[in-house]
């Protein structure tokens, strides 16, 4: 049984109630308060609690005025390693414990508040990694310490981790998972069990200490022969000494939809291995469409529970926050992607279909907009740790600030100011949005504003932004390209200005990127990618309305095509 732990922090009110007297209280589908918030009466305190299932426990002890208190769970040889939350200094810890009674012993904790909760597995995927949009900055350990580590207990890695960082995370009681692919998945002929086993057996999860499990990507549609080979290799892996006591995670689709995949799923369940169910939900055209996509997720999960009773206790539901080029579920610039993420988290943690869910994950940091990555951590905290049932984000699903973001209706709601006759038009190109990175494939975004620079004077398009909240920060995003030289590896200059608002240039950038290797259209492929430029400008509203001005900024004769003009509330670091 793992008895180590990590700590993070959040402000807690001081309550004059002995911590050990509180009764467990279910907060939502994934969080249960085992010991209520209360002040420690003496210098030493013993807190008894019962973990309702094998899994993660969150311990919070407030912000100390002096030295950190010493905390030990059960008969552990070492004390918990606290982590002070970067925003408020409160001490928190997470530890993976078996179901049943436990005891927390605190020394030097007088007047500190104590709060103990059962929480889900909260996973971050992947570290180390770097974003495809380099302007976001590195997702390095310093970034993780500030924005990610306080709110997760599991990190998925697919590459070498700095030894000191690896050891620190293990000391804190949290968990590393090592990623591996699934041999034979892309081949028509099944692999041999020996081939599959040999590949998994050389993974660091077997050859190096400290990992909690192996997460294999991915169990989807395949033949009976494939599943027979994978099942045999999986069984042999569990018999391997280096894998003893570790967990096999199956990244998967609907494993109940074929007899052979369902049979393998039953074996995984009997062994208490875990499923990581992929639910990468694209934005809907409106809120009703978005809710229907979440409802389909609910109905599919009901099928899981029908075929594998109790599977919710072995399920990590993997959402997708692919929200930036070159592959993005944020494909509708008229919708607020952060509102949609909040809708998904709210459903997982409050809808009865997901009651008892073991864990939650977002896939994956490489493709995540940096702002959305930070925002998702706030959702993990709000729902999975604090156990809230009220929505975190009450903004409307459809963004009210700008209309006709993809120029699908020509210049409706826009005012075009061409520098010369015929130098500004709306055009379309089949596959344009797919090459941009919108996923899954859609015709939305195949229309765009086209400009051709004429002499020294720029072309301009303008739109009045509406329903802004004075003092609130917003981003303007756009994606541009040179339609005459789409394969040219260069940035397309585009100037974005918001008149009547305070521009915040420290958050703005333009970054050229190639189309995703799997997004092929016409002559463009992984070997001959199309090139686009992702633009972001950020402003603080001074009034309920402002004027958005976009102009081309290239050399005379240069062509620029752009769309995906999204104006959305911005989450500042």
Describe the residue ranges of each PLM region.
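Short beta-strands within extracellular/lumenal beta-sheet-rich domains
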Residues: 38-50, 88-94, 111, 451-472, ...
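Extracellular carbohydrate recognition and processing domains
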Residues: 36-41, 76-96, 501-545, 555
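Glycan-processing catalytic domains of CAZymes
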Residues: 98-109, 114-395
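Extra-cytoplasmic beta-strand recognition segments
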Residues: 55-63, 407, 459-492, 535-537, ...
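Extracellular glycan-recognition surfaces and repeat-rich motifs
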Residues: 406-448
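Short carbohydrate-recognition loop motifs
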Residues: 29-38, 431-457
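Beta-strand acidic-aromatic groove motif in beta-rich domains, primarily in extracellular
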Residues: 66-71, 416-418, 459-461, 484-500
């Amino acid at each position: 049984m793992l008895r180590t732990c990590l700590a993070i922090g959040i402000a807690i009110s001081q309550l004059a109630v002995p911590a050990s007297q509180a009764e467990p209280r279910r907060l939502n589908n994934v969080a249960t308060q085992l010991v209520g918030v209360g002040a420690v009466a003496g210098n030493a305190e013993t807190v008894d609690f019962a973990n309702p299932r094998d899994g993660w426990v969150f311990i919070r002890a407030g912000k100390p005025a002096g030295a950190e208190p010493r905390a030990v769970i059960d008969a552990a040889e070492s004390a918990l390693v606290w982590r002070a939350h970067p925003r408020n200094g409160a001490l928190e810890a997470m530890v993976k414990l078996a179901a049943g009674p436990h005891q927390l012993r605190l020394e030097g904790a007088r007047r500190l508040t104590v709060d103990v909760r059962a929480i889900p597995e909260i996973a971050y995927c992947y570290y180390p990694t770097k974003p495809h949009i380099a302007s976001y900055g590195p997702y390095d350990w310093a970034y993780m310490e500030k924005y990610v580590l306080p709110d997760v207990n599991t990190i998925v890695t697919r590459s070498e981790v700095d030894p000191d960082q690896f050891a620190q995370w293990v000391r804190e009681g949290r968990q590393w998972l090592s990623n591996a692919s699934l041999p034979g998945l892309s081949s028509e002929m099944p692999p041999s069990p020996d081939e599959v086993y040999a590949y998994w057996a050389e993974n660091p999860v077997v050859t190096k200490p400290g990992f909690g499990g192996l997460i294999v990507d991915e169990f989807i549609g395949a033949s009976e022969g494939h599943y027979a080979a994978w099942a045999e290799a999986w069984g042999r892996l569990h018999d391997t000494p280096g894998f003893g006591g570790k967990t096999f995670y199956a990244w998967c689709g609907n494993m109940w939809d074929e007899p052979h995949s369902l049979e393998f799923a039953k074996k995984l369940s009997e062994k208490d291995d875990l499923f990581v169910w992929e639910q990468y939900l694209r934005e809907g055209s409106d809120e009703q469409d978005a809710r229907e996509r979440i409802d389909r997720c609910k109905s599919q999960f009901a099928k899981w529970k029908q075929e594998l009773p109790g599977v919710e206790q072995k399920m990590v539901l993997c959402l997708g926050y692919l929200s930036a080029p070159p592959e993005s579920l944020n494909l509708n610039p008229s919708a607020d992607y952060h509102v949609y993420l909040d809708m998904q988290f709210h459903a997982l943690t409050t809808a009865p279909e997901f009651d008892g869910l073991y864990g939650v994950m977002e896939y994956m940091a490489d493709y995540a907009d940096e702002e959305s990555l930070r925002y998702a951590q706030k959702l993990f905290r709000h729902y999975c740790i604090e156990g809230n049932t009220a929505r975190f984000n009450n903004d409307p699903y459809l963004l009210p600030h700008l209309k006709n973001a993809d120029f699908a209706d020509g210049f409706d709601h826009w005012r075009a100011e061409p520098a010369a006759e015929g130098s500004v038009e709306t055009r379309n190109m089949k596959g344009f949005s797919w090459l941009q990175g919108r996923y899954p494939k859609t015709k939305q975004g195949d229309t765009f504003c086209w400009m051709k620079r004429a002499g020294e004077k720029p072309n301009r398009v303008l739109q009045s932004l509406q329903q802004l909240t004075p003092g609130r920060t917003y981003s303007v995003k756009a994606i541009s390209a040179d339609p005459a030289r789409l394969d040219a590896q260069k940035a397309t200059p585009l100037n974005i200005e918001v008149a009547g608002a305070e521009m915040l240039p420290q958050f703005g950038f333009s970054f050229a990127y190639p189309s995703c290797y799997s997004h092929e259209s016409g002559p463009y492929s992984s070997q001959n990618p199309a090139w686009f430029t992702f633009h972001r400008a950020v402003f603080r509203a001074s009034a309920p309305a402002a004027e958005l001005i976009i102009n081309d900024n290239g050399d005379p004769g240069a062509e620029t095509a752009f769309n995906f003009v999204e104006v959305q509330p911005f989450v500042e670091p």
